[in-house]
Structure formats: structure tokens, C-alpha cells
């Protein structure tokens, strides 16, 4: 296991994209050792490739819902056949849950430990970020970086800071740097990095890097065997419901 984990908070706007590296080599401590902010999308493949020995936890949908992909493919040929349309009483559920949500999104929404509904990659502006990730993913593969959308193999996994914080029983609200220091008492950073933490994008990247550590330690919730095929198409959001202290071995 490598001693450094990276978190990447991705946006279509480089001024809202941040990457943070945490060094875990000192017992009982997670030290911020690198911050890249702002960060352009075209700079990300080389950055990840250069640090491929580390785990990367990325805040972006790795894929689209299976049903959404099928719907777009089928409807591109013409109107949907009557047999493919749910009864009218189920239209809202079909639109907002079955089409909009991936398997991993429904899990986070329904699990009583987490109860966080991710924004849908199929709808809203998040689709543009997911499309950008599709380009980054292709470039990473061309650099020889292994990509498993389920996040079980290779160096890269998907996460969602709001769900990660909720799973750690910290609520879903974004945390400031002082709040992160209170929630994760083992976090530390040199003063030169502190100006970067004024915005929430870098702080979100810190949460992603914490999830990367949890994934390294086998502490994140993984898809079940029967869910694995879908997770490898749609992506799987990694969060940990274990004690935060376990990130530093307590």
C-alpha cells in the first residue's frame, strides 16, 4: 500500500477543480503534501499517470445509468414502444429514480447509514462533468493507467464527498478546513497550503483523499457480486461507514 492518497474534485471549470495529496507515512497523521488548484482538465491525465502508485478518489460520476443509456439508444431510433413505457402512476418514479439514478446512487439514497441522494449524471449539469471524465478516462487508459469503474482494481475510484461525510456521521454539508481539522483530528498541513483551503473545492478534494485511504485499507462499501457487472459499467461511489480513527490505524 502506497503512503500517499490523492483526492480530485472535478468540475468543467478549472477554477473549481482541485487535487490534494495526503501523506500517511507518519503514524497517526495525514499531512497535506500537495495541492493543485486551479487545475485544468487536460492536465489531469498526466498528473494521475505520474502518481499512479497512489490511490486516487475522484468526485465525478464514472458512468451513466444503464436504463438511461438504453433509453437514449432506443429513443434515437424513434418513439418508445408502448411496452417500454411504465404506467402513468409510475412516471415520476421511473423518471427520477430508474432512469436518473445508477445502482450506486440508489444504494446511497436508500442505505440508512448514509441516506444521501447524489446528483444524477444523466440529468442536470453534472452530465457535462461526466462527459469530461469520459475524455480523461480515455487519456488515462492511453497512459497505461488501469481503470475499473467499480474502483476495486487499479489506482482510481469514484467517490462523492457529501455521501462520504454522511457515512462518517458528519452530515452532508460541505466542511471548511477548520471543520475538517475538528472532524479528522489527524489532519495537518503546512502554512503555505492554508490559503488554498479558503474555498470548498480544495476541501472537497481533501475528503476525496480521505476516501482514497479508506479504499486502500479495505474500509469502503463495495458492490455485491450480483451488482459488480453494473458497477463496472456505471461506476460505484466509494464511502466508508467505519470509524474515522481507522484511517490512521486506531
Q: Could you describe each region identified by the protein language model?
A:
Residues 1-6, 10-250:
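RNase H-like (RuvC/DEDD) metal-dependent nuclease/polynucleotide-processing core
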Amino acid at each position: 500500500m502506497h503512503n500517499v492518497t490523492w483526492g480530485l474534485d472535478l468540475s468543467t471549470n478549472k477554477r473549481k477543480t482541485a487535487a490534494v495529496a495526503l501523506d500517511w507515512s507518519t503514524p497517526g497523521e495525514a499531512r497535506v503534501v500537495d495541492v493543485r488548484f486551479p487545475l485544468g482538465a487536460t492536465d489531469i491525465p498526466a498528473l494521475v499517470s505520474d502518481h499512479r502508485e497512489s490511490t486516487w478518489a475522484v468526485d465525478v460520476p464514472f458512468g451513466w445509468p444503464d436504463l438511461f443509456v438504453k433509453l437514449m439508444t432506443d429513443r434515437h431510433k424513434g418513439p418508445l414502444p408502448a411496452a417500454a413505457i411504465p404506467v402513468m402512476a409510475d412516471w415520476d418514479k421511473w423518471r427520477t429514480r430508474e432512469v436518473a439514478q445508477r445502482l450506486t446512487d440508489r444504494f446511497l439514497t436508500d442505505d440508512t447509514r448514509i441516506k444521501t441522494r447524489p446528483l444524477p449524471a444523466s440529468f442536470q449539469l453534472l452530465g457535462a462533468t461526466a462527459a469530461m471524465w469520459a475524455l480523461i478516462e480515455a487519456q488515462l487508459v492511453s497512459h497505461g493507467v488501469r481503470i475499473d469503474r467499480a474502483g476495486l482494481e487499479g489506482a482510481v475510484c469514484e467517490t462523492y464527498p457529501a455521501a462520504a461525510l454522511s457515512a462518517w456521521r458528519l452530515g452532508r454539508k460541505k466542511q471548511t478546513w477548520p471543520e475538517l481539522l475538528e472532524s479528522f483530528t489527524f489532519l495537518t498541513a503546512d502554512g503555505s497550503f492554508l490559503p488554498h483551503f479558503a474555498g470548498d473545492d480544495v476541501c472537497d478534494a481533501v475528503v476525496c483523499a480521505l476516501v482514497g485511504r479508506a479504499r486502500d485499507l479495505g474500509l469502503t462499501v463495495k458492490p455485491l457480486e450480483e451488482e459488480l457487472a453494473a458497477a463496472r459499467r456505471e461506476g460505484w461511489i466509494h464511502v466508508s461507514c467505519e470509524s474515522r480513527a481507522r484511517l490512521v490505524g486506531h
